[in-house]
Amino acid sequence: MRQYELTHAIYTPSSIDAGIAAFGHLCQATAERLVDESVLTITGGDEALDPELLNYILALAAQEILR
């Protein structure tokens, strides 16, 4: 079991919500909204926390920035 905590101002609420919606069946994920950033905590088995999940959230965040 591993846990990742991703904290960065570029993670907008919509990108985090989209990532949780897409991969929530693979792991437990919670998001905490702060004033200028969001904290995403992902907990699950090693197979659930693969780079695909983290890259997906990064890609969504990048799309948010480009809009």
Task: Please describe what each predicted stretch is.
Residues 22-28:
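Short amphipathic beta-strand starts and helix->beta connectors
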Residues 5-14:
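Short, surface-exposed ligand-recognition loops at beta-strand->loop->(often short) alpha-helix junctions
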Residues 16-19:
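Hydrophobic side chains in well-ordered alpha-helices
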Residues 29, 34-36, 41-67:
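Helix-rich interaction surfaces within compact, conserved domain-sized segments
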